């Protein structure tokens, strides 16, 4: 991307496509989406159902899968596994002025809870900044990510 410095590009290239860790005995995987080793999305499914999620993330050794790519919130508990997509943090599309996030809590008694968070912010300032810096593909970005024509 032409707005990134060479060191930023190199940093991004070195990021893993998936991070696995354990917290209070719960196995957690964090990834952009279900991807192969070439960092390509596989089996993209918009608005996945519970059965879609079980197919998209078939590894049974994870207690919690945190993923993104699809900007629509999806929080699902199925077969003792959690699938968490908090939705888009900074690209509200048609839900103007809302940044979405989620809070995952794991208690020592093994109880897991997930809370959705919505925070209003001034998208106009972001769109104006995109124009000001002459961001590449700004028209498409504003249309698809911010609902601005």
PLM regions and their residue ranges:
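Active-site environment of divalent metal-dependent phosphoester hydrolases
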Residues: 36-37, 64-77, 91-96
């Amino acid at each position: 991307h032409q707005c990134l410095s060479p060191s930023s590009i190199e940093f991004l290239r070195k990021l893993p496509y998936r991070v696995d860790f354990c917290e209070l005995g719960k196995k957690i995987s964090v990834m952009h989406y279900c991807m192969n080793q070439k960092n390509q999305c596989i089996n993209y499914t918009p608005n996945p159902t519970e059965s879609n999620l079980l197919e998209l993330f078939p590894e049974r050794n994870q207690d919690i899968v945190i993923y993104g790519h699809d900007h629509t919130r999806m929080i699902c508990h199925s077969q003792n596994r959690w699938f968490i997509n908090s939705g888009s943090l900074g690209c509200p599309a048609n839900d103007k002025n809302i940044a979405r996030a989620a809070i995952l809590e794991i208690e020592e008694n093994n109880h897991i809870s997930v809370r959705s968070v919505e925070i209003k912010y001034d998208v106009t300032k972001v769109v104006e900044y995109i124009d000001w810096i002459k961001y590449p593909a700004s028209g498409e970005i504003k249309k698809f990510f911010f609902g601005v024509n």
